[in-house]
Amino acid sequence: RTIYENREENGLVIVARTDARTVVGLDEAIRRGNLYLGAGADVIFVESPESYEEVCRIAKEINGPVLFNNVEGGRSPFLSREQLIDAGVKLTIYPNAQTRVVTKKCTELLETLKMTGSTGQMADQMLSHKELWAMFDHEKWVAIENKYIVR
């Protein structure tokens, strides 16, 4: 209730999740999603629809924005952007996609290091230091550090 009452001033979006699809069925998941909207949720996340048709039904029958969890190799179908738009899905997440890619690449790097004693063979697959620092706005953080550092 506190989050709901104070969300306007900080731009918070409340996403309500239901796992009812897996346990008690799609009808109950949709019913709960609509109840969550009535209680103040902004977006509804029905976990584990089992087909594209179910995703379409969820987006049609829930009376507000729907989030879809797009996971490669998950229980739900992996859908294209066009399918999601056509279904009426308003927000899509890709949980663990980056982590899975990065972990695979890190494993390759460590295997290369173990086998050859060097990571140099993979230098062409790495960001330059300049590119890396730009991603993290390094200069901004150095300026903050310099402002507060005791010398």
Predicted feature locations:
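Alpha/beta enzyme core
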Residues: R1-Y94, R100-T107, E111-T112, W141, ...
